[in-house]
């Protein structure tokens, strides 16, 4: 009984990191998922992780322990946000498409954040999450938080968050996110650009034709046709996004931790 009590502070640190990870991670962090389920899943995963990682020495609950708890929450939030930032490229691609289609005014509520999200972006994002479940990519996300304890132990008080390389890594991750969004939306956006160009030529040659009445349904039809044609390519990009997400999480751990 005494050994269990001595190990409880270290277990609580593991539980804090995993709970913070589940707050921001895609799929598990949705507001539609009950908080009791997330806490329970985080608890059982913390039990599994704690039974396999190297046990730290006995920890006292003092001001140093409060710093460790804050560090664990920060590590979990950073890992979850990096994973969400990579997959959020799908929503950004949808916002590019919505803006060109004329759907930018018709937003829906994002269940992840509660904020407004583009209509096509939310549709593609939901399809990406279902695809993630079908290929078991969510297992890789859980592997990421599990192996984080090998890079950043629970008794390591000060990870290298203040390093210049960390700021460069975050900027590079943002750059990768927008590049992926551009790659996913480029076929549809380019097609809509050609439609706008054709409508401009028609407006100059046939002034009697109201291009504003014809243009909106035409652009919507072309957009859906291009989405159907390019859907397989979009899923290939989404699969690469999953691989990039895991690679980004591991690079972050290698950067701020000690392997």
From Swiss-Prot:
What InterPro entries does the record tag this protein with?
A: FliR, T3SS_IM_R
Q: Give me the segments passing through the membrane.
A: 8-28, 33-53, 73-93, 117-137, 177-197, 218-238
According to the UniProt record, one GO cellular component term is:
bacterial-type flagellum basal body
Entry keywords, A to Z = Bacterial flagellum, Cell membrane, Membrane, Transmembrane, Transmembrane helix
Its subcellular locations are: Cell membrane; Bacterial flagellum basal body
Provide the topology term for how it sits in the membrane: Multi-pass membrane protein
The primary location reported for this protein is membrane
Q: Which domain of life is it from?
A: Bacteria
Q: Which Pfam families match?
A: Bac_export_1
| Role, per record | Role in flagellar biosynthesis.
Q: What is this protein called?
A: Flagellar biosynthetic protein FliR
Per the UniProt record, the source organism is Bacillus subtilis (strain 168)
Task: Report the gene name.
Answer: fliR
């Amino acid at each position: 009984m005494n050994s269990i009590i001595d190990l409880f502070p270290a277990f609580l640190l593991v539980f804090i990191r995993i709970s913070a990870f589940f707050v921001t991670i895609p799929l598990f962090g949705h507001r539609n998922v009950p908080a009791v389920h997330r806490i329970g899943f985080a608890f059982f995963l913390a039990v599994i992780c704690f039974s396999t990682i190297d046990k730290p020495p006995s920890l006292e609950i003092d001001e140093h322990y409060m710093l460790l708890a804050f560090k664990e929450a920060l590590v979990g939030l950073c890992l979850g946000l990096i994973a969400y930032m990579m997959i959020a490229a799908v929503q950004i691609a949808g916002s590019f498409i919505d803006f060109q289609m004329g759907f930018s005014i018709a937003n829906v509520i994002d269940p992840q954040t509660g904020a407004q999200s583009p209509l096509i972006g939310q549709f593609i994002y939901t399809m990406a999450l279902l695809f993630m479940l079908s290929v078991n990519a969510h297992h890789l996300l859980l592997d990421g938080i599990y192996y984080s304890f090998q890079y950043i132990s629970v008794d390591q008080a000060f990870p290298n968050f203040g390093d210049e390389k960390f700021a460069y890594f975050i900027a590079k991750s943002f750059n990768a996110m927008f590049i992926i969004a551009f790659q996913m939306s480029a076929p549809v956006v380019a097609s809509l650009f050609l439609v706008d160009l054709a409508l401009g030529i028609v407006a100059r040659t046939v002034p009697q034709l109201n291009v504003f009445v014809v243009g909106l349904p035409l652009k919507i039809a072309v957009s859906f046709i291009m989405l159907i044609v390019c859907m397989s390519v979009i899923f290939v990009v989404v699969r690469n996004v999953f691989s990039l997400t895991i690679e980004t999480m591991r690079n972050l751990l290698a950067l701020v931790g000690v392997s």
